[in-house]
């Protein structure tokens, strides 16, 4: 068996958490299963995998509205897929127009909650429809046409989804750039996309202070010759320079525009957006997604995995600068006609109870966030959520990285009242929607993402293209295409082929390599182990970084952990752990030894961290992923490379030199 298959599971999670029967029976997926006559969840998942074209056809008919029906579900010429051939659609029609012209016209689409306490706004579907139409007409007045790119560099304010939807409506391609990126990060993305227009704001709020954003755009577009216009939202009232002939205020652009705008009837393969992935060196990867797939994948998974219903108040805390914001703040919930929270600010401003106060005030019933936030709340203590009434919560969900078992238990008990299932989701910018996740009916193992969702043929391969046995790990692959899959890298077909399809091309052409690895335990539950290159090689054993980190976090004094391998002449690598302690815990040499012993007791001697450091923070992306590449480079005295994607670049200095 190839070496990747030898990444064995060191620890078996035996705890099972079952969902209350009323939540199961209420869930969208359970009701579909019963309607179809399946007796078990396993039977349903297997049928949907084997009959994936029939399944996706039904999802496309259920969750999307088509101007013209498609005549062919899929044309698959690996590595290129075309879905819903012959049809006509537009995701803006599905997300906004059809609701504004139905009984939902006065239903709330977004409760906007600004960072300043009390800065709130309610936006109905009809109001959203009018705002999108005005902005769409505004963009057209600036010369934006079908296929043109529009870069969006905004904080989490209503104008962000409005501009995304306005682009979609007229067939323009949006490219959202996270507002935390510097001018350099923005410039590379605007230049690569050849954006005609950039939409930004004067500034944004961070922990109560208005900070400028527009100057980053001014700097970035100096070296972006494609940019003709810059549209500026007046958010914080800062005095910013406006370049005559190029810059225009958002409110001036839209104020006299008609509140009606024709929605382009598009081919399902027409591009909806380009989103640049970050965190690696070199040129950013512009991942292309299409209208047809985004009319289906995010809506289906919002309904099935997150179990969002008509009467729910749903909150995904992600920023729209990332794929989670695209799929689960904008397109998924809006295509369902759901009511969502749109929150601008930090999770702990003005205090660490801010999110819980929003859940209490708005009666949030489905709450989707990231492990890094959950661990931050754990560190602050149980007393904070206890101050608030969180009984409205029915479903919890997690995204961004594996949710370690201790954080799972804390989240379920303290936020979910010991009742709410936690939908721990694995997916990627490239997949467009959830791929592996429990359904509300799934018995859950803390730390596991359970099973591939209905409609996906997902497997774990060794390097020779063999499906690995239970108890072993390897590379996550997709054996068949799916509607919301990436269509290409923007103007880089060679990289697209090399990165995702080349690995198994000679053995099983059309096999998608995700770049992440996973294991399956004896019960078939999936455990995400991080990136393919995130593996420790200790004395001939291959050990997952994530598994060692999870063991460290199960120590009562530890809030968060990151581990790397340090080269060693004898063992190949020795394990080095960087530990963030819980509030009030005192650092000591004895505690370092105790944490190392604890990891050994949980995972065995092979996983013993020979070196333990206490740090205040570790480098993470804005989506909460620990940047082990950066930690390892800094610790070993090597160049750290591109750190523009870090949420906390100052944390790099916390990492000591260990050579």
UniProtKB/Swiss-Prot annotation:
Gene Ontology BP annotations: acetyl-CoA biosynthetic process from acetate
Membrane listed as a keyword: no
Coiled coil (residue ranges): none
Catalytically driven reaction(s): acetate + ATP + CoA = acetyl-CoA + AMP + diphosphate
Residue sites binding Mg(2+) per the record: 553, 555
Superkingdom assignment: Archaea
Disulfide bond annotation, renumbered to this chain: none
Annotated EC: 6.2.1.1
Binding site for ATP: 400-402, 424-429, 516, 531, 542
GO MF annotations in UniProt: acetate-CoA ligase activity; AMP binding; ATP binding; metal ion binding
Record InterPro entries: Ac_CoA_lig, ACAS_N, AMP-bd_C, AMP-bd_C_sf, AMP-binding_CS, AMP-dep_synth/lig_dom, ANL_N_sf
Listed NCBIfam families: Ac_CoA_lig_AcsA (TIGR02188), PRK00174.1 (NF001208)
Biological role: Catalyzes the conversion of acetate into acetyl-CoA (AcCoA), an essential intermediate at the junction of anabolic and catabolic pathways. AcsA undergoes a two-step reaction. In the first half reaction, AcsA combines acetate with ATP to form acetyl-adenylate (AcAMP) intermediate. In the second half reaction, it can then transfer the acetyl group from AcAMP to the sulfhydryl group of CoA, forming the product AcCoA.
Family: Belongs to the ATP-dependent AMP-binding enzyme family.
Name of this protein: Acetyl-coenzyme A synthetase
Native source organism of the sequence: Methanothrix thermoacetophila (strain DSM 6194 / JCM 14653 / NBRC 101360 / PT)
Gene: acsA
């Amino acid at each position: 068996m190839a070496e990747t298959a030898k990444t064995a599971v060191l620890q078996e999670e035996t705890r099972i958490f079952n969902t209350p029967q009323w939540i199961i029976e209420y869930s969208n997926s359970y009701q579909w299963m019963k309607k179809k006559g399946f007796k078990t969840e396993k039977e349903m998942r297997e049928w949907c995998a084997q009959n994936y074209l029939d399944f996706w056809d039904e999802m496309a008919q259920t969750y999307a509205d088509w101007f013209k029906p498609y005549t062919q579900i899929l044309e698959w010429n690996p590595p290129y897929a075309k879905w819903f051939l012959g049809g006509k659609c537009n995701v803006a029609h599905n997300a906004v127009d059809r609701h504004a012209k139905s009984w939902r016209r006065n239903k709330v689409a977004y409760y906007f909650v600004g960072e300043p306490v009390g800065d709130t706004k309610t936006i109905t579907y009809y109001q959203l429809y009018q705002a999108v139409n005005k902005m769409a007409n505004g963009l057209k007045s600036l010369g934006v046409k079908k296929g043109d790119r529009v870069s969006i560099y905004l904080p989490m304010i209503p104008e962000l989804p409005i501009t995304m939807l306005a682009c979609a409506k007229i067939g323009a391609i949006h490219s959202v750039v996270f507002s935390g990126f510097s001018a350099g990060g923005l410039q590379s993305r605007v230049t690569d996309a050849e954006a005609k227009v950039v939409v930004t704001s004067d500034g944004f709020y961070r922990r109560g202070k208005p900070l400028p954003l527009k100057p980053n755009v001014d700097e970035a577009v100096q070296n972006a010759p494609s940019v003709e216009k810059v549209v500026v939202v007046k958010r914080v009232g800062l005095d910013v320079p406006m370049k005559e002939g190029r810059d225009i205020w958002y409110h001036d652009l839209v104020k006299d525009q008609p509140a009606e705008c024709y929605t382009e009837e598009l081919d399902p393969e027409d591009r909806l957006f380009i989103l640049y992935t970050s965190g690696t060196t070199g040129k950013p990867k512009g991942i292309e997604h299409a209208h047809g797939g985004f009319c289906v994948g995010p809506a289906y998974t919002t309904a099935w995995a997150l179990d969002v219903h008509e009467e729910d108040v749903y909150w995904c805390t992600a920023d729209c600068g990332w794929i989670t914001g695209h799929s689960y703040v904008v397109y998924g919930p809006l295509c369902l006609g759901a009511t969502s929270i749109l929150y601008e600010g930090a999770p702990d401003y003005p205090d660490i109870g801010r999110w819980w106060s929003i859940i209490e005030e708005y009666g949030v019933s489905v709450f989707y966030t990231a492990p890094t936030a959950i661990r931050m709340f754990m560190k602050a203590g149980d007393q904070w959520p206890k101050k608030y009434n969180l009984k409205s919560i029915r479903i919890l969900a997690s995204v961004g990285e594996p949710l370690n078992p201790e954080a799972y238990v804390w989240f379920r008990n303290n936020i979910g009242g010991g009742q709410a299932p936690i939908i721990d989701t694995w997916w990627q910018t490239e997949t467009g929607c959830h791929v592996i996740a429990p359904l509300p009916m799934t018995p859950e193992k803390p730390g596991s993402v359970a099973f591939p969702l209905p409609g996906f043929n997902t497997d774990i391969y060794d390097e020779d293209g063999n499906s690995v046995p239970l108890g072993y790990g390897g590379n996550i692959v997709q054996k068949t295409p799916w509607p919301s899959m990436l269509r290409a890298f923007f103007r880089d077909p060679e990289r697209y082929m090399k990165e995702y399809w080349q690995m198994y091309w000679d053995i099983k052409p059309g096999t998608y390599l995700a770049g992440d690895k996973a294991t399956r335990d004896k019960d078939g539950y999936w455990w995400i182990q991080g990136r393919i290159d995130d593996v420790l090689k200790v004395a001939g054993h291959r050990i997952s970084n994530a598994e060692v980190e999870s063991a460290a976090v199960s120590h009562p004094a530890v809030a968060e952990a990151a581990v790397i391998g340090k080269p060693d002449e004898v063992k190949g690598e020795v394990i080095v752990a960087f530990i963030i302690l819980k509030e009030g815990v005192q650092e000591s040499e004895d505690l370092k030894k105790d944490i190392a012993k604890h990891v050994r007791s949980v995972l065995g001697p092979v996983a013993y961290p020979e070196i333990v450091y206490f740090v205040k923070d570790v480098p993470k992306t804005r989506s909460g992923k620990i940047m082990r590449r950066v930690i390892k480079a800094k610790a070993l005295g090597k160049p750290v490379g591109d750190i523009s994607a870090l949420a906390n670049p100052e944390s790099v200095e916390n990492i000591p030199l260990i050579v």
